[in-house]
């Protein structure tokens, strides 16, 4: 199995913790010269396994109770090609590899073990995991009751407010849980963000491409509230092709992803790559740090208007992305680009034969013009608004006269969107 995810989302810590359940735990870190050299000079998997077994005093009969962890596997094409032989020659030995920026190495790996590997994906902590990290188990249990009750709502809103500001990077959350001191976090953000900047440019094919990537990571945060154009991105002179290629590298690294809209109102969700995309950072806390708005956010009672209304939609998309642990899929949004009636719905959720529109608004008074355009075209009467209020369901009508059902959800329910949609459709028998 390969555990995939951006740097510093907790892959190594997670596998090391899991390794405690085995009698024997062997770790190779391919960023360390000694471990990398061991792999490179091994002529076969048999030779490597025999050496590791001898070094760690393990016999073949112990393999079922042994976990071999190969960390930073993106550093070695040979290690990746070895994975198929672990599967074929030592099926009783448990092997987990972890890596970031894997796409770049996989392109160059000749003997890639297709069909021999399972993938799991790891993301920054979502809100549920953030509550669990704080030991808020009773509140988490109330969160998981569908629908959530009014008593828990205020406490959940307060916790989500802080989560929106600091984000879900494990080192950040661990520090905050231990010290409850937001002033101690900027140095950690700086270290994490600089690591990402240094990492991604390693995979540029030329100095010119490196410069484009540097420009993007230094300016992209300012454009999270809008759809982008590649040509002259960030007020530069870079051409569309240059920027597109650089964004592809950043997207593969999961540091800054490019999200394309769809225009259909029925499944399947089909991204339209001719339309202008929008950007999704790995973590909203890093985004807030890069925008230098965390101090301002601390003073706000309601984050719905934070940074031109972009922060809450960004964190909700991050929440939805975090659920893709076995099959990585980007989030989707819907657009209608017409001169007289353009529209944009923040999020689409596929549910059976329906595409469910999710609009993210500051309150019940916010305009639902775009949502209404989707509802008018959709073959079902179902829509969701995520806002800063309590859970409720209302029967309403679009300005064009189409009756529909609107489920209003508090912002903090991003990871439970599918459960609520299922609850709603079941309750109202909308099939």
Where are these regions (language model features)?
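Short glycine-rich substrate-engagement loop in P-loop NTPases that contacts/grips substrate
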Residues: 32-64
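Interdomain hinge/linker elements that couple catalytic modules in large macromolecular machines
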Residues: 132-313, 321, 332-335, 340
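Sensor-1/coupling segment of RecA-like P-loop NTPase cores
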Residues: 89-110
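Conserved lysine of the Walker
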Residues: 11
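Short regulatory helix/loop adjacent to the ATP-binding pocket of P-loop NTPases
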Residues: 103-119, 131-136
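Conserved P-loop NTPase "ATPase switch" module shared by AAA+ and STAND
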Residues: 60-79
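A cross-kingdom feature that marks ATP-driven nucleic-acid transaction machinery
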Residues: 1-2, 6-8, 17-23, 251-431
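Conserved catalytic segments around the Walker B and adjacent sensor/switch elements
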Residues: 21-36
């Amino acid at each position: 199995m390969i555990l995939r995810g951006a740097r510093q989302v907790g892959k190594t810590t997670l596998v090391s913790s899991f390794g405690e359940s085995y009698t024997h735990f062997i770790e190779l870190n391919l960023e360390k010269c000694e471990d990398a050299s061991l792999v490179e000079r091994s002529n076969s998997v048999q030779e490597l396994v025999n050496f590791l077994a001898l070094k760690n005093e393990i016999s073949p009969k112990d393999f079922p109770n042994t976990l071999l962890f190969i960390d930073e596997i993106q550093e070695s094409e040979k290690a990746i090609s070895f994975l198929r032989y672990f599967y074929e020659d030592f099926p009783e030995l448990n092997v987990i590899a972890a890596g970031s920026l894997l796409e770049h190495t996989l392109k160059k790996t000749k003997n890639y073990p297709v069909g021999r590997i399972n993938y799991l994906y790891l993301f920054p902590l979502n809100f549920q995991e953030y509550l669990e990290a704080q030991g808020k188990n009773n509140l988490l249990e109330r969160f998981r009751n569908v629908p959530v009750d009014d008593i828990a709502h205020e406490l959940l809103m307060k916790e989500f407010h802080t989560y929106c500001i600091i984000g879900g990077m494990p080192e950040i959350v661990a520090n905050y849980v231990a010290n409850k001191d937001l002033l101690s976090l900027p140095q950690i953000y700086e270290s994490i963000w600089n690591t990402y900047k240094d990492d991604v440019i390693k995979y540029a094919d030329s100095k010119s491409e490196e410069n484009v990537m540097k420009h993007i990571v230094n300016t992209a945060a300012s454009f999270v509230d809008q759809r982008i154009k590649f040509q002259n991105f960030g007020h530069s002179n870079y051409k569309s092709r240059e920027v597109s290629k650089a964004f592809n590298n950043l997207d593969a690294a999961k540091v800054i992803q490019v999200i394309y809209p769809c225009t259909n109102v029925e499944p399947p969700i089909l991204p339209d790559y001719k339309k202008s995309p929008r950007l999704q950072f790995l973590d909203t806390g890093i985004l807030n740090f890069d925008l230098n708005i965390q101090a301002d956010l601390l003073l706000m009672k309601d984050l719905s208007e934070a940074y031109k209304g972009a922060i809450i939609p960004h964190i909700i998309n991050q929440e939805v992305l975090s659920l893709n642990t076995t099959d990585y899929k980007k989030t989707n949004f819907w657009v209608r680009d017409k001169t007289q009636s353009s529209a944009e719905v923040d999020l689409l959720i596929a549910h059976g034969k329906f595409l469910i529109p999710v609009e993210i608004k500051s309150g019940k008074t916010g305009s639902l013009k775009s949502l209404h355009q989707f509802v008018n075209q959709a073959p079902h009467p179902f829509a969701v608004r995520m806002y800063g209020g309590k859970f409720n369901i209302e029967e309403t009508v679009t300005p064009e006269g189409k009756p529909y059902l609107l489920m209003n959800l508090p912002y903090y329910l991003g990871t439970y969107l599918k459960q609520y949609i299922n609850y709603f459709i079941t309750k109202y028998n909308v099939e």
